[in-house]
């Protein structure tokens, strides 16, 4: 039986989450269902490099990219198209079946990575979490104990950072918000979901999964 291979990716963008104007960091981990890693890449996209220091969200990590670029820990490419081609070529070389991200409605819709679909199938890890981990009473308890609350205040937080804090039992965990680092934790979240052996959806973004048949759970804050 052929082994299923996955590509978990993450993007960091300038211009905000609603209408990003460019991707400056693209990272991915290619792996199997057990977390055995076949390849990784972290790409700094130079056409948007100068924009990092002027973006309210991105600039806090500008020093990280400067240091990693100087040390060779991150690879510089000229354009988004160059970065996309590297990711796509890796997926083709390793026979990837599913590309994945935590909220594919952003990474596979609003960035250059949208061009990976429909060539590859996809899994929205965020939707997967809502169909699995978020149904656990222990998750809601953990969120309440550590004040992990959604922006509306009506439900427990369901970000990748909070979910990873839960599965690692580390309430102090903070995402680095660099693409490869975030892709690693999203892969770990995916593997934890798989181990639950629960039904989950494929080839649909969380925001498009409407109706009771998708069995999404946003744990209520109030007990």
Predicted feature locations:
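Short, polar/flexible loop-turn hinges at active-site or ligand-entry regions and domain interfaces
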Residues: 69-74, 116-118, 170-175
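Conserved non-catalytic scaffold segment of RNase H-like nuclease domains
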Residues: 2-110, 114, 161
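Acidic two-metal-ion nuclease catalytic site recognized across multiple nuclease folds
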Residues: 148, 180-223
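Active-site catalytic microenvironments for nucleophilic, acid-base chemistry
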Residues: 114, 166-170, 189-196
């Amino acid at each position: 039986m052929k082994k299923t291979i996955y590509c978990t990716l993450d993007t960091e963008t300038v211009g905000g989450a609603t209408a990003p104007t460019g991707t400056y960091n693209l990272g991915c981990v290619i792996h199997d269902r057990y977390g055995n890693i076949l390849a990784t890449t972290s790409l700094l996209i130079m056409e948007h490099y100068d924009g990092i220091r002027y973006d309210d969200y991105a600039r806090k990590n500008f020093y990280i990219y400067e240091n990693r670029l100087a040390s060779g820990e991150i690879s510089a490419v000229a354009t988004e198209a160059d970065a996309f081609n590297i990711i796509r070529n890796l997926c083709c070389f390793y026979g990837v079946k599913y590309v994945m991200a935590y909220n594919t409605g952003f990474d596979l819709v609003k960035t250059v990575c949208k061009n990976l679909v429909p060539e590859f199938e996809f899994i929205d890890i965020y939707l997967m979490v809502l169909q699995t981990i978020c149904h656990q009473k222990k998750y809601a308890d953990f969120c309440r104990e550590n004040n992990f609350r959604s922006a509306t205040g009506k439900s427990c937080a369901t970000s990748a950072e909070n979910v990873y804090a839960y599965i690692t039992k580390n309430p102090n965990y903070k995402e680095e918000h660099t693409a490869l680092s975030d892709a690693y934790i999203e892969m770990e979240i995916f593997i934890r979901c798989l181990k639950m052996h629960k039904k989950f959806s494929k080839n649909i973004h969380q925001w498009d999964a409407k109706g009771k048949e998708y069995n999404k759970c946003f744990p209520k804050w109030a007990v």
